[in-house]
Design a protein with these regions (language model features):
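Hydrophobic/aromatic beta-strand patches that form the interior of the parallel beta-sheet core
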Residues: 61, 107-109, 138, 195-200
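Catalytic cores of processing enzymes, dominated by hydrolases/peptidases
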Residues: 146-226, 230
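Flexible, glycine/charged-enriched surface loops at secondary-structure junctions
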Residues: 60-62, 229-239
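Generic structural signal for well-ordered, non-membrane alpha-helical segments
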Residues: 40-44, 48, 114, 118, ...
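Internal, conserved structured core segments that host functional sites
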Residues: 104, 112-163, 185
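N-terminal short beta-loop-beta anion/metal-coordinating cradle
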Residues: 1-111
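Flexible, glycine/proline-enriched loop segments at strand-loop-helix junctions
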Residues: 34-38, 108-118, 168-176, 206-210
Length: 239
């Protein structure tokens, strides 16, 4: 595997702030919500957008997406304006330093899911986890389910240690499904001794292709429960 540290850049000033806050205590929780294979109702995407729009953020890590994306399978958009091309939608994958409503710092990994070099990407995130003493990584996304929208949304919780989700009900037995980068990340972090949990919000299948804010609200409520962060969920409820 090629050197994982060569696919991302760290802002030294923001890094110094994170390290100063972590000195002598626990580091920041890392929340991840990358846009990838499955995100029914846009649960993870809307959650990430809410956090970056409602809370104070600083860019800590920027990934080199040219090394990680297959542009021909997921083409960015661009506007043709009469006689010229403008507004190229540049894809990004980044980690932001975010402060919750009480000023508690945490990290947010968001943007596009890598198409290639998953192992290198997972190793890069592990380096970030270890550098900044991250005690817990929490992932969120949505999955389509045969449920009505008139009932409260439920989640499937998963973790690399069963103690992390002891209070949750298991909805499934063993099932083989296509992987995503978040699943690999959870596995690799566990193999390295780092705690990671995730929440897949059950979204009514007929709403899976449309933005469904209630799914992101549910996702963030479970992130709060797992991490103790205060994430301004009420603002999303009112939107």
């Amino acid at each position: 595997m090629l050197d994982p540290s060569e696919i991302y850049d760290v802002d030294p000033a923001v890094a110094a702030e994170v390290e100063a806050r972590s000195a002598g205590g626990a580091g920041p929780v890392l929340v991840h919500a990358v846009r990838g294979f499955v995100d029914a109702g846009g649960a993870g995407r809307l959650a990430a957008e809410h956090l970056t729009e409602q809370l104070s953020t600083s860019r800590l890590v920027t990934f080199d997406v040219d090394q990680l994306l297959d542009y021909r399978s997921r083409r960015p958009t661009v506007t043709f304006d009469s006689t010229r091309w403008i507004d190229y939608e540049e894809p990004e994958l980044a980690v932001d330093l975010v402060r919750d409503t009480s000023g508690v710092p945490f990290l947010l990994l968001h943007g596009v899911e890598p198409d290639v070099q998953w192992e290198r990407f997972a190793a890069a995130v592990r380096q970030i986890v270890e550098r900044f003493d991250v005690p817990l990584t929490v992932g969120v996304h949505g999955v389509p389910m045969g449920i009505p929208h008139t009932r409260p949304l439920t989640v499937t919780a998963h973790a690399n240690r069963p103690e992390l989700i002891a209070d949750y009900t298991s909805w499934f037995g063993s099932v083989r499904v296509p992987a995503d980068a978040g699943a690999l990340l959870e596995i690799r972090l566990g193999e390295s001794g780092h705690d990671a949990v995730g929440f897949a919000v059950h979204v009514p299948h007929y709403l899976a292709q449309s933005p469904y804010p209630q799914a992101s609200i549910t996702a963030l409520e479970h992130v709060q429960r797992a991490s103790g962060l205060e994430l301004e969920v009420a603002a999303l409820t009112e939107a």
